[in-house]
């Protein structure tokens, strides 16, 4: 009887250990993005435009953003997805105030007349009057029309890493 209990106990222990190991190894793969040391002129143009966009958002320059955002653009936040009109209204009203974005890495990929940017950022914002700082992987999609880049999609994906920005926004 003791042998049976010991074997059963060892079997259960082994099954639990394997189950825990399988759960831990099933974490989604992650790939760290790195800023290119020598971006192409076109990549640099889109990266610079994205950096300017963060400044415009922080300073609530809705007129400049209105020109940058494509009429069919979409914005995906932690709380929902909406179009250009709602995004501009949200910025103008202060519903979301993008106070400061610290970009740690950015990768730009050009596909003909389209560009996809991935940005590893910490975003300091006021949402509904509450100060928040979150780590995000931001995906921006731009399309080139008549020689000018237009923002077509902006998506915030919350990261599991800790915020790197200090309390002073650095």
Each language-model region and where it sits:
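Positively charged n-region of N-terminal signal peptides that target proteins for export
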Residues: 1-5, 23
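Bacterial N-terminal signal peptides
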Residues: 7-17
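Boundary at the C-terminal end of the N-terminal hydrophobic targeting segment
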Residues: 17-23
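A beta-strand edge to alpha-helix "cap/lid" segment located at domain peripheries
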Residues: 23-67, 74-170
């Amino acid at each position: 009887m003791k042998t049976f209990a010991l074997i059963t106990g060892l079997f259960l222990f082994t099954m639990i250990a394997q189950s825990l190991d399988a759960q831990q190894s099933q974490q989604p793969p992650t790939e760290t993005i790195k800023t290119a040391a020598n971006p192409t002129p076109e990549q640099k143009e889109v990266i610079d435009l994205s950096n300017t966009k963060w400044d415009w958002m922080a300073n609530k320059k809705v007129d400049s953003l209105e020109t940058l955002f494509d009429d069919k653009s979409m914005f995906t936040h932690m709380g929902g997805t909406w179009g250009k009109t709602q995004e501009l209204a949200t910025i103008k009203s202060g519903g979301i105030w993008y106070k400061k974005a610290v970009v740690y890495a950015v990768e730009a990929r050009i596909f003909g007349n389209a560009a996809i940017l991935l940005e590893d950022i910490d975003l300091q914002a006021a949402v509904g009057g509450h100060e928040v700082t979150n780590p995000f992987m931001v995906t921006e999609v731009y399309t080139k029309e008549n020689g000018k880049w237009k923002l077509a999609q902006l998506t915030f994906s919350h990261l599991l890493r800790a915020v790197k920005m200090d309390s002073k926004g650095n």
